[in-house]
């Protein structure tokens, strides 16, 4: 694996066959699939030059599985659902063979959250029963990194590919003279631009949507992105902010959003002794006012009357399907049934309904209603979800259904925030002052995106938002324009013959897409026959 340790003074930028922008799981999985195909091909193939541009110091993991997440952060899916074969088997073997090493590290560095997780899962750990475990996410990052290091070495030994890592932020993209030119802001003495025949955009989701009107630092503690610079450092900021508040009545934390990131923040606060000792209250506000439901693996009896009635019709419209799902789940919730454990049943009925929809209505559901369906049945594992239950049980945590209108600094100049929100058609000011505000409210839409790279690529006609405005429009070969490809969350919201997803974040889904992208890239780069990915 090569890097650029020297100052690039040449006018002509270094040129590559392929440039990956972003080095997270989507990039790693695509490169691993490419490596498998190249290494198993019986035919010699021209050596590829591949660049991987990453703004953070850690390559191959991305935010969820890397150092920007807390060591204690857990996967939201148990291992049986987290990965598909053959990757699942390889991961199991790795977990078992390296258990002594990673478990000792986790115990030493993971604090109270790690100690609780190890205690709660001791029997499964001792018996190497991995399938039902919600594993620490960093483990998958280490697993991916070790696979990448081995693949890079093998490709180099066979003279099949040279993978060059470049520590820089991609700032711009345009096409010229049959190549794409990527402008870079290097960290250190790296190149300020590269050229590539093909580009793979693997930068994850758009930036977090800010909730403060001003860019200036407020007097209160404001965390706009829980993973920037990292989960551990932001928990430390919360700890310090509460330490500075003398009055116990004012040691309050506001969390905006009730998604998986919000749940993770609550989990880490619950297991931080200093935060627990000092915090008076934690308020979570979101439109639903509901956290992801706890998976208990105890499916309740429920017949889904609206959905079953709809399935008796000849043809189904997307809006009618969404309405039936919403009504049935509302009925189930009124009966105090656990929606997490109804997921498999409603997913099966959804599959039946899909077969009764024409392509126009299928696309309508995927692009208009899909994310709303996902929000209705968001789920989380016991370990992570139980922490918020415990915070609620002791009176620390309260959930509020409403839309945040603004968060302002206190007029008195004291280091506290006030929150104004809309609920039940009226505007309210929350009575509690907040020492800290954590923004977990989701990502920017692409038409108002602040990412310089995405803005440049869209302005230069290389890509455009799809119907959801959360992903980029691509064809069956993952191309937003010829040779300008997209992988990862930005593929969500596409409806093509081969790519039909409204949400692309789970590891198995990304891996399946990476397999297809790798095959497409190699087919376009290599004139020789390659083993299928």
UniProtKB/Swiss-Prot annotation:
Question: Which Pfam families does the entry link to?
Answer: NAD_binding_9
Q: Where is the signal peptide?
A: none
The UniProt record lists the keyword Transcription regulation: no
Top-level division of the source organism's lineage: Bacteria
Instruction: Enumerate the transmembrane spans.
Output: 1-21, 135-155, 193-213, 472-492
Subcellular location, in the record's words? Answer: Cell membrane
* Topology versus the membrane: Multi-pass membrane protein
| GO (cellular component) term, any one | plasma membrane
Keywords from UniProt, A to Z, are: Cell membrane, Membrane, Transmembrane, Transmembrane helix
The name under which this protein is listed is Uncharacterized protein Rv3403c
What organism is listed for this UniProt entry? Mycobacterium tuberculosis (strain ATCC 25618 / H37Rv)
């Amino acid at each position: 694996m090569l890097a650029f340790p020297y100052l690039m003074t040449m006018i002509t930028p270094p040129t590559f066959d392929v440039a990956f922008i972003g080095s997270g799981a989507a990039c790693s999985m695509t490169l691993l699939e490419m490596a498998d195909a190249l290494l198993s091909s019986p035919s010699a193939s021209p050596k590829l030059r591949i660049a991987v541009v990453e703004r953070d110091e850690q390559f191959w993991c991305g935010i969820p599985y890397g150092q920007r997440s807390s060591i204690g952060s857990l996967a939201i899916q148990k291992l049986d659902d987290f990965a598909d074969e053959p990757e699942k088997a390889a991961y199991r073997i790795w977990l078992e063979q390296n258990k002594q090493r990673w478990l000792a590290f986790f115990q030493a560095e993971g604090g109270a959250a790690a100690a609780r997780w190890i205690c709660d899962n001791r029997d499964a750990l001792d018996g190497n029963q991995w399938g039902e475990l919600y594993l620490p996410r960093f483990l998958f990052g280490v697993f991916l990194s070790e696979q990448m290091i081995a693949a890079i070495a093998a490709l180099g030994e066979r003279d099949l590919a040279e993978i060059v890592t470049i520590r820089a932020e991609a700032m711009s993209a345009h096409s010229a003279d049959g190549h794409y030119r990527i402008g870079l802001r290097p960290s250190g003495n790296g190149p300020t631009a590269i050229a590539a025949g093909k580009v793979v955009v693997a930068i994850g989701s758009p930036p977090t949507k800010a909730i403060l009107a001003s860019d200036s630092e407020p007097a209160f503690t404001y965390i706009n992105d829980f993973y920037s610079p990292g989960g551990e450092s932001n928990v430390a900021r919360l700890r310090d902010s509460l330490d500075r508040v003398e009055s116990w009545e004012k040691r309050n934390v506001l969390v905006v959003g009730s998604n998986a990131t919000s749940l993770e923040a609550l989990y880490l606060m619950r297991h931080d002794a200093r935060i627990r000792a000092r915090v008076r209250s934690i308020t979570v506000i979101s439109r639903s006012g509901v956290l992801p439901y706890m998976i208990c693996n105890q499916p309740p009896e429920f017949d889904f009357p609206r959905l079953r009635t709809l399935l008796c019709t000849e043809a189904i419209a997307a809006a009618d399907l969404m309405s039936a799902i919403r009504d049935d789940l509302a009925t189930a919730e009124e009966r105090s049934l656990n929606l997490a454990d109804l997921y498999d049943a409603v997913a099966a009925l959804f599959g039946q309904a899909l077969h009764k929809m024409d392509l126009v209505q299928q696309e309508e559901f995927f692009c208009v209603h899909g994310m709303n369906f996902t929000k209705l049945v968001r789920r989380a594992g016991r370990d992570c979800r139980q922490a918020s239950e415990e915070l609620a049980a002791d009176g620390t945590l309260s959930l509020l259904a409403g839309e945040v209108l603004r968060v302002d600094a206190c007029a008195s100049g004291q280091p506290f925030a006030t929150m104004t929100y809309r609920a039940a058609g009226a505007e309210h000011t929350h009575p509690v002052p907040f020492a800290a505000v954590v923004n977990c409210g989701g990502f920017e839409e692409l038409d108002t995106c602040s990412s310089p790279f995405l803005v440049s690529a869209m302005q230069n006609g290389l890509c455009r938002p799809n119907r959801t405005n959360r992903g980029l429009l691509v064809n069956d070969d993952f191309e937003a324009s010829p040779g300008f490809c997209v992988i990862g969350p930005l593929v969500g919201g596409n409806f093509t013959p081969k790519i039909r997803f409204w949400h692309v974040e789970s590891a198995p889904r990304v891996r399946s897409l990476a397999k297809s992208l790798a095959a497409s890239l190699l087919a376009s780069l290599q004139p020789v026959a390659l083993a299928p990915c």
